Curated annotation (Swiss-Prot):
<comment type="subunit">
    <text>Interacts with RHOA (constitutively activated, GTP-bound); the interaction inhibits DGKQ. Interacts with PRKCE. Interacts with PRKCH. Interacts with PLCB1. Interacts with NR5A1; the interaction requires both LXXLL motifs in DGKQ and is required for full phosphatidic acid-mediated activation of NR5A1.</text>
</comment>
<dbReference type="InterPro" id="IPR020454">
    <property type="entry name" value="DAG/PE-bd"/>
</dbReference>
<keyword id="KW-0862">Zinc</keyword>
<protein>
    <recommendedName>
        <fullName>Diacylglycerol kinase theta</fullName>
        <ecNumber>2.7.1.107</ecNumber>
        <ecNumber>2.7.1.93</ecNumber>
    </recommendedName>
</protein>
<dbReference type="GO" id="GO:0012506">
    <property type="term" value="C:vesicle membrane"/>
</dbReference>
<dbReference type="InterPro" id="IPR000756">
    <property type="entry name" value="Diacylglycerol_kin_accessory"/>
</dbReference>
<dbReference type="InterPro" id="IPR000159">
    <property type="entry name" value="RA_dom"/>
</dbReference>
<keyword id="KW-0472">Membrane</keyword>
<dbReference type="GO" id="GO:0030297">
    <property type="term" value="F:transmembrane receptor protein tyrosine kinase activator activity"/>
</dbReference>
<keyword id="KW-0677">Repeat</keyword>
<dbReference type="GO" id="GO:0005886">
    <property type="term" value="C:plasma membrane"/>
</dbReference>
<dbReference type="GO" id="GO:2000182">
    <property type="term" value="P:regulation of progesterone biosynthetic process"/>
</dbReference>
<keyword id="KW-0770">Synapse</keyword>
<dbReference type="GO" id="GO:0046339">
    <property type="term" value="P:diacylglycerol metabolic process"/>
</dbReference>
<dbReference type="GO" id="GO:0070493">
    <property type="term" value="P:thrombin-activated receptor signaling pathway"/>
</dbReference>
<dbReference type="GO" id="GO:0007189">
    <property type="term" value="P:adenylate cyclase-activating G protein-coupled receptor signaling pathway"/>
</dbReference>
<feature type="domain" description="Ras-associating">
    <location>
        <begin position="390"/>
        <end position="489"/>
    </location>
</feature>
Amino acid sequence: MATAAESGARTWPGSGSPRLGSPAGSPVLGISGRARPGSGPERTGRAIGSVAPGHSFRKVTLTKPTFCHLCSDFIWGLAGFLCDVCNFMSHEKCLKQVKTPCTSIAPSLVRVPVAHCFGSLGLYKRKFCVVCRKSLEVPAFRCEVCELHVHPDCVPFACSDCRQCHQDGQHDYDTYHHHWREGNLPSGARCEVCRKTCGSSDVLAGVRCEWCGVQAHSVCSTALTPECTFGRLRSMVLPPSCVRLLSRNFSKMHCFRIPETMVLELGDGDDGLDGSAAVGTGREVSAATESTKQTLKIFDGNDSMRKNQFRLVTVSRLARNEEVMEAALRAYYINEDPKDFQLQALPLTLLSGNAQALGKAGTTEEETSKDSGPGDSVPEAWVIRSLPRTQEILKIYPDWLKVGVAYVSIRVNSQSTARSVVQEVLPLFGRQVEDQERFQLIEVLMSSRQVQRTVLVDEEPLLDRLRDIRQTSVRQASQTRFYVAEARAVTPHVSLFVGGLPPGLSPQDYSNLLHEAMATKAAVVSVSHVYSLQGAVVLDVTCFAEAERLYMLARDTAVHGRPLTALVLPDVLHTKLPPDCCPLLVFVNPKSGGLKGRELLCSFRKLLNPHQVFELTNGGPLPGFHLFSQVPCFRVLVCGGDGTVGWVLAALEETRRHLACPEPSVAILPLGTGNDLGRVLRWGAGYSGEDPFSVLVSVDEADAVLMDRWTILLDAHEIDSTENNVVETEPPKIVQMNNYCGIGIDAELSLDFHQAREEEPGKFTSRFHNKGVYVRVGLQKISHSRSLHKEIRLQVEQQEVELPSIEGLIFINIPSWGSGADLWGSDSDSRFEKPRIDDGLLEVVGVTGVVHMGQVQGGLRSGIRIAQGSYFRVTLLKATPVQVDGEPWIQAPGHMIISATAPKVHMLRKAKQKPRKAGAIRDTRVDTLPAPEGNPL
């Protein structure tokens, strides 16, 4: 640990009497934001005493229109009150009502530390950073699980206050409180308490519960009941108390099956002014800000020196020592007395070297004691060091729920050990009668991206431990907690889903195959579930290290030329589910609907429990059905095109016997091009940016209906090979049909479109472009004549049916074809029954060519009604284009047998909108939840 500077060392000690509003006189420290020199309000006075949690307010002169962060109203006049630490701006009249804590003390107020899941950089319009409270005018990060937005250089200072979405054996509670997130509400948001506007698009104002969505002013939120009931979607949410995942060796990205992005580090920032700070990664300052000011590079301990990450602080050349120390501490949001720290100069020779040399420089004091004068060509560089302490006040938190007690404070000295601290605090928590040997002290590092727990040995000297933490990073010390916890033997258990294996093998064969590919350890790895048809297994792993090894190895392993898929799955405690709980299992195809699929994926993770939202490109629908296999009642939402819906329904049919709820109802959010099934079930022609919350409410209110599914057996004739006189036999093929099956011209058009999309997939990202390609392909076939009726034979219910002169034969199960066209028509006909999706009948329709198909699309004509039945046999006399639900191919000569699949599937049809009475108050969450925005770069 750095001690006082030796003779000849240049230091800025944090001595002297602190002025009012300084770190010593205020309960909080921090930086004043990302302001450029001269861009912020002009400071006109000394800091005033702060009654708000941790803020250090200063009266400033306003030079541009400014809004209050509490009431979100415009600040009239020239004077406002700005927190030097977090940029919180307030009216003078609002100061006494400020409840929002300052950024620098926010980590100490976190109830249960949970790390965030930051995705890729994106542009988020009219959003604000929760750390510095400034707008996100540059690419920024957002959490994939909660509504936290943050600048890249502010990420290290964000709290680990994400939603707790499962139990992990630590801090497990059955009762959940509101999880408040400040700001980024729409301008029309209304407070749940006073019914006045609480949102703003100009500043970070108002709060919203991440679970139930209730919105309120920060002042009014204290009037609400602390317990959260999950709001309007409570019956659809998978309760966190009913999900268990021991994720010791896995990141949050692994736990929620979110693709990992770049490792976040401090990025380049803006130059600071008057104690404000900006982040740098070895970036030099281009020019001096003012002749009367100097810019300093400030490092925080050995860790930032090793990574060559610093923050720039600009102060007056006439600044007192304590003022420079305060500015340096504010730059890193350090909420401690500046008299306990000093600044040590770093030599110019090390600054011009590489990051590795700079990291080594932080290990010895002799190397950092060289002089670095203000006249150097680069800004002066200093490192924050903690002065030696003979004793400290340490906060100890209970690892169990203790009503009315968040922590206790005790004094530790050089004689204090982890065991002595445990013995001292247990009586303070009311556990004095219990065996103290069963308790241990746990150190918890609460960074924004990872929460690390370390069990301290009984003989660990705590004062030395704190010294080592501060030597590494002073900011890290403020993000470190100590918990007293009962030592419990946790039995490791991790469920790993492994897909991409060869189908049709036995459990023993799969076990042997995995052992050959990944050298699994039989003592701790066993196959718990086998899905032979899909070529997938679920492994039970009773060793955390082995589970992590298998997970990382499987993602880089291929078996029989196919890459494996590995997912970490939690356990759903189905016996703990509330009686009225019917959770929604969500499948999203991010490739559908352009970027809308990706945005919906993020939105549903935030509205529901992210464990119940699955990305279909990462393992398909099988992992989701396995996770919900023991849930007695659940529903399904499929976000994608008709092909995606068919994919999920096929997986449901294959796994039905494994499910405790064998017939879940399925809703659709159409993202494809045609979306015929979505149209029939009233979900619309395609998703056009509706509020995701409103979509979930519609799913909850939807009506259950039955729908027929059909099995098509494709049995090709034997093919004679003229080269070697060998008879080749194409094996029979079985496909499932939900919407329609086309033979002839419509399948040929679909095949041409499919081939064009495979050649240039990047161009097929919008429905408008896709339909344009269909039109162009159709025009090319307008003079085509095939005489399909001469090339096929049709039997309906064992009876031969004579076909008229047609080019296409279509079997339809739903009254929508080709993006909403009514191919059967609405005219009544005594020969046929009125079609329904659950009548057990298929309608057979013919088309005479591309022109006829265009007329049907335009509503000018209908198709040629040929037959209606439940069993069909089609004989193909030559190779013919065939398509089923939009998937085309060339079918060899042979037979096609179409028959009903039992049982019928349960679908959800959107309820008709009821007319709203004039003046009726709408649901707050429905009105005010912002639509997803932000495009990944």
